[in-house]
Each structure stands twice: as structure tokens, then as C-alpha cells.
Amino acid sequence: MSATTDTTPKPKGGWWALSPLAVFLCLYLVTSLLVNDFYKVPITVAFLASSCYAIAITRGLNLEQRIYQFSVGASNKNIMLMVWIFILAGAFAQSAKQMGAIDATVNLTLHILPDNLLLAGIFIAACFISLSIGTSVGTIVALTPVAVGLAEKTGIDLPYMVAIVVGGSFFGDNLSFISDTTIASTKTQDCVMRDKFRVNFMIVVPAALIILGIYIFQGLSVSAPPQVQTIEWIKVIPYLIVLGTAVAGVNVMLVLLLGILSTGIIGIYTGTAFFDWFGAMGTGITGMGELIIITLLAGGMLETIRYNGGIDFIISRLTRHVSGKRGAEFSIAALVGIANLCTANNTIAIITTGPIAKDIALRFHLDRRKTASILDTFSCLVQGIIPYGAQMLIASGLAGISPISIIGNLYYPFCMGTCAILAILLRYPRKYSGEG
């Protein structure tokens, strides 16, 4: 007989319900920091150990039911969607590299952008694309292979280059009208998108301008190769198709499928053998294997935390001793941030904590437009700096580097978070903050 169980969280867990997350962080982050090597402990092993621990501490279920509950999280529709995107992204990235699309796009970028504006140009491109398409994942999928190619050609540190793309991608993820997080935050707080946009704009644009200035300054020392190779315009077409369809708002999976087809058609036209194209796609998909395993293990572990009452425990603790508008806003920020830490999905974190945030806002007379902005901004902050988030995993997978090496080079999410904290402390923007 197959194991079945109610997925509604029943156990009323305390800190023990959150302990699998602590086990993972200790195994991966703390151990890696102690030995000063983030490749010493594979992230898959850290997740496997913490997942086994999460299953072991689950109460009220036999072993078969615990494994079933874990599998419910691993096979969640959001997790599965991420897996399909990873598969298509791997196939596109490798086939684009094999037929020369990445080299052609890199050469075009080096030709168009002055050396000293290369870093700033990549950041602006990531901000613009993410603002246009409303998704950080789509932006990272489109730009990371180009960032890798630019790093190889210019000698710029690879994790630093990829971090520019990841950081810029969260600008639009947080601000775009069509972002899932914008929709979730405005719907849960019953406010109009354009009003939330105004508040968000005032908070995060200063952060983006500060980081842009840093990249312009740091770019002064960048020098491109003395002779950029001739641009093969026809090989740039796959990337133009990917960027064009992404900006037009086409579903990211269809964007990647069109990109894969275009690399095949143009590759064969320019001399790539048909089966070499197939081989490149296979190599790309296989290369995403570790990333997919991490995603499944993380999904299962985080679902177990939810089932054991970890998120409910956080909510009850953070809302217990709230006083004053500042305290109320900080409690909402902490609420959505920790929920995001436990779900690794900023949209789900907002949906989970949105109703509680609305109650807090009503109780302390907070402006719902700023409440929506706080939910969106702090969920994006946490999503941007966790090593097991979809954005960090896909960026590290495409670049072949550790997620922690990217996090160590991130500027924008931390600056955005600092500006958001200052906005709460200084009651900014005044129009939407009231008295503290």
C-alpha cells in the first residue's frame, strides 16, 4: 500500500523544526569558511545530510510517510518548473557555445562598449532586461553565458562578472510591474501596482545608482583584448532571439526552446554537424545534473520544515512583541525574509506572510503601499544571497563555479537591503511612512 499523508503542517514545532536549515548552513557555510575552500564540502552532500536529518526529526509519521512528505516538496510544481528551466538552459547554453553564438555575442559586446564601461554596461543590461521581463531567472539564463565569455576574453574574475548579472537581475525582479513578487505583494496588501512602484522606486533606485557608480569606477581599470575578433553577425542571431522574445514577455521556457532551435538551424547553416548539435545539447543537459539534484533535495527539506511547523513558529515569534511603526515594519521585513530563507522562493514567501503583514499594517496604521514594497524588497534581498535559491543555482551551474563565490562578489542586493533598512529607520519616503 502506498504511503499517503495530509500535507497540512500538523506538528507545532519550535526551533527544532528549523534545525535542518541550521545543519545545512553549518555543514556547508561554516565548514567551508573554516577550511577556506568552498569546494571542499560539495553542496549536494550538505543538502543530503540535512535532508536525512529533516526526515529523521519529523514527528507523527512513520518512515514511509516521512519520505513521502519529503517527496511532496521535491515534486512541488514550482520545483518541477525550475528543473525544466534548468534542463532547457543547459541545452541552450552548451549548443550556443558549440556553434559560436556566445563568442560572437561577446565580440559584439566588446566592439560596442568602451572598455571602461564594460562592467556598468552589463549591469545596466541586467537591470533593463529584468525590468522588462519581470524575472531574474530569465535574465540570468540570457546573460550569464555572455558574462562568462567576457570574463574569459578580458581576464575579469569570473565570479565577479557573474555577480554583476545576478545583482542586476534582482533590480527588475523587485521593481517590474509584471514580476511575480510585485503581483503577490500588491494583491496581498490590496494596493495598486503603480503606487507600490513609486515607493519601491524611491527606495531601490538610489541603491542601483550607487552600484552603477561603483562599476563605472572599477571599470576604469578594465582593458579588452587589443584586437577583437571579427563579428560573425549571423551567429549573434540566437542571442538576439532570446533577448528579444524575453523582453517581449514570452514565457522563459518558450524563449529557451526558440534559442535552442535557432542555434541548431544557424549552426547547421554555418557548418555545424547535425549530431554535434545534438551532442552539445546532451552535454548541456547532463551538466545541469548536480543543479537538479540540489533543487530536489532543497525542495524536500524545505517542505519538511514547513510540515513540522517551522514557518508557523517564525510567524508567531516575530509578531508577538511588535510595538510602533518602525517595529511593525521591521517585523514584516524579518517575517518575509525568514520565510524566504525557509522556502527559497520569494513569491511563495510573500504569499505565505502577506496576510499576516496586512494584519500588522492594519493594527499599526502602516501605509499598505510601503508594506507591499517592504515585502517585495526584503524577499528579493534574501533570495539574492542564499546559495540554494534558483537564481544562484542556475548562475553557478551555467558558469561552473560555487554559489558562495558569486555571493561574495554581490553588491546590489546588499545595497538594496541597506537602503530598505534606512527607509524604515528614517521613515522614508515620508509620504508613505507616517510617524515612527
Sequence positions of predicted segments:
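Re-entrant/interfacial helical elements at transmembrane boundaries that shape
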Residues: 138-150, 166, 177-190, 346-360, ...
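Core transmembrane alpha-helical segments of multi-pass membrane transporters/permeases
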Residues: 44, 48, 56, 67-100, ...
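Hydrophobic transmembrane alpha-helices of multi-pass small-molecule transporters
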Residues: 1-87, 199-294, 433-436
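Juxtamembrane helix-boundary/capping and inter-helix hinge elements in multi-pass membrane proteins
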Residues: 61-63, 75-79, 155-159, 184-196, ...
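Alpha-helical transmembrane segments of multi-pass membrane proteins
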Residues: 85, 116-129, 155-172, 327-340, ...
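Juxtamembrane and boundary regions of transmembrane helices in multi-pass small-molecule transporters
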Residues: 2, 167-170, 174-229, 234, ...
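Membrane-interfacial loop-to-helix junctions in multi-pass transporters
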Residues: 76-82, 107-125, 151-161, 205, ...
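Hydrophobic alpha-helical transmembrane segments of multi-pass integral membrane proteins
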Residues: 83-92, 114-146, 318-358, 375
